[in-house]
Amino acid sequence: MLAININQPHATKIENQQFEEERALYNLKESDVINCAFAGPADGESVLKEVRDINVINCQFSLRYPLWHAVKFSLVGSEMDGNARAPIWYAQDGKIRECQLEGIKLLRECQNIEVEDCTIHSPEFGWKCNDIAIANSEIESEYLLLDSRNITIDHLQMQGKYSFQYVEQLHISDSVLDTKDAFWHSKNVTVENSIVKGEYLGWFSENLTLIDCQIIGTQPLCYCKNLTLINCTMEDTDLAFEYSDVNADIKGHVISIKNPKSGTIIVDSVGEIIQDNVLTDSLGKVKIRREQWNIFD
């Protein structure tokens, strides 16, 4: 849990107003913006662009690009609807808490952003960001966190597809991820105590580690380098581990394992071990655990 502390209150307060003009509060500094609405027929862009050290509390956003190039900001108890497109780009040192955020392309090329207790529906959320922490939140997104670095996620309910592709240095714990094509081309990712549901999990990843996870879906974990599974279960998983360098300790049954490239896969039972149409050396070993004797067949 992040337990975000927002910035200290400021003497300058802007309260209970509506803004609709372009750059309405441009370069605002050391201020609190409270119970304000950013909407109207003027349809102005970039209402809070280039702000510094501000708190935005209980505000409504329905205009494009509201918080670009913001530095040291808190966004608390606020809402952004679908008209608030690309709302937070090139921002740094931000804290987002208890918000309902709907704008497409939320967070792009941002640095040091904390998100907690939020509900987010934003296709293309979090692209090319660095130092992102997310906790106790719900996110629906396609291409979640594409090509981002240094990410910590805890207690996330996530739904979408093509998630975490090309990410590096990611840690996820106690989360539910319902997403196809997750972790493709990722590097140095650890997922703990989580449910990971969706087809084609983790292809072409490097240094992907799953610990105490429930893995669900067809053809997972193929073409991986240095893949590790510790105390995981696998459901509806067929054609797993094709051409992967893998060391895995799996509890329960796997439908089928195909052409593991190297390493050892320990499993309670497997429906089929497939070794055919091999395009490269497939020297991985599959061992069946016989728990009552603690030996392997």
Residue ranges and their predicted role:
Residues 1-297:
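Long, distal/terminal scaffolding or interaction modules
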